C-alpha cells in the first residue's frame, strides 16, 4: 500500500538524475510499512540514497508481462475508467481478448493493461508498456477500471504475466553487461509466484554480471527509467548496476536509490 505519491515525485525528477527504487511491500494497509533513516523510523514518505557520479552506474528495467491481442486507442475515458477502446465498449474488447487466450493463460494470473510509453512507435512489444492491473468492470456501461488514470488518445494493449517472456527480457538486458555489484528492486509478483522457484532474478544478476554482490528488495511497484523518463512500474525487475565496464555507463550523472512507503 502506498502512502507516498511516487508519480508526483518522479514527474519532478530532473532529466540529469537517474532514480531506481521501489515501493515497500510488507504492509496490508497505508502507513503499515516502516522506513528507516539513520536512527529515525517513519511510517510514510520515502528514503533515498544519493550516489556520486563516476561510479559506472547503469540502470536496467526488465518487464514481466507479454502483450496479447491487438493494441487499441482509448476513445472514451474518465479518471481510471476506460469506457471505450477503438469505439467499442472496453469490456467487450477485454472479453474478446480473454476468449482468444489458451486455457492455461485464461485461468492463470489474470489480465493486465499495458499503457504505451512512446506513442511515436509503429509497433509495440515487451518493454514498450507501463503495466497496470485490471481492477474490475461494469457490465451495464462496459467500462473497465484499471490501476491508473488514462487519457483519450492513449494506446493500450492487454497483457498476461509470462515467465518465459520475463526470463528472456531480463537475460537479454543483462547479456552485454559486467558489473561489480547491483541493487535490485523486483516485484513481489515475480519470484516463485511467476517462475515457480524463489531467487530467479537475483540468480540472473549473479550469473550474468559475474558478481555475488547483489542486494535489493521485493516491491509493490518498481521505479526506473524507460524512454528517457522515470516511471512507476509493475511486475518488473528494476536495478542499478554499479562498477560497470559498459560504454553507456554514467557520464557524471548522479543516481538515486529510493525506497518508498
Predicted regions located by residue number:
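Small-residue-enriched flexible segments
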Residues: 1-212, 217-261
Amino acid at each position: 500500500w502506498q502512502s507516498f505519491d511516487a508519480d508526483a515525485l518522479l514527474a519532478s525528477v530532473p532529466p540529469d538524475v537517474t532514480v531506481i527504487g521501489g515501493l515497500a511491500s510488507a504492509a496490508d494497509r497505508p502507513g503499515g510499512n516502516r522506513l528507516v533513516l539513520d536512527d529515525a523510523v517513519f511510517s510514510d514518505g520515502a528514503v533515498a540514497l544519493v550516489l556520486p557520479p563516476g561510479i559506472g552506474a547503469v540502470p536496467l528495467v526488465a518487464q514481466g508481462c507479454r502483450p496479447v491481442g491487438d493494441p487499441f486507442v482509448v476513445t472514451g475515458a474518465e479518471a481510471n475508467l476506460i469506457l471505450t477502446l477503438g469505439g467499442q465498449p472496453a469490456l467487450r474488447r477485454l472479453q474478446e481478448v480473454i476468449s482468444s487466450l489458451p486455457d492455461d493463460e485464461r485461468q492463470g494470473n489474470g489480465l493486465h493493461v499495458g499503457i504505451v510509453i512512446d506513442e511515436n512507435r509503429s509497433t509495440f512489444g515487451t518493454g514498450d508498456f507501463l503495466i497496470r492491473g485490471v481492477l474490475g468492470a461494469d457490465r451495464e456501461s462496459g467500462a473497465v477500471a484499471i490501476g491508473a488514470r488514462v487519457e483519450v488518445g492513449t494506446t493500450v494493449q492487454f497483457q498476461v504475466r509470462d515467465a518465459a517472456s520475463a526470463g528472456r527480457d531480463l537475460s537479454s538486458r543483462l547479456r552485454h553487461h559486467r558489473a561489480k555489484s547491483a541493487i535490485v528492486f523486483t516485484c513481489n509478483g515475480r519470484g516463485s509466484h511467476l517462475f515457480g522457484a524463489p531467487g530467479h532474478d537475483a540468480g540472473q544478476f549473479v550469473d550474468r554480471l559475474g558478481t555475488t554482490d547483489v542486494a535489493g528488495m521485493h516491491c509493490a511497484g518498481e521505479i526506473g527509467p524507460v524512454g528517457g523518463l522515470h516511471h512507476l512500474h509493475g511486475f518488473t525487475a528494476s536495478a542499478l548496476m554499479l562498477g560497470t565496464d559498459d560504454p553507456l555507463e554514467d557520464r557524471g550523472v548522479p543516481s538515486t536509490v529510493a525506497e518508498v512507503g
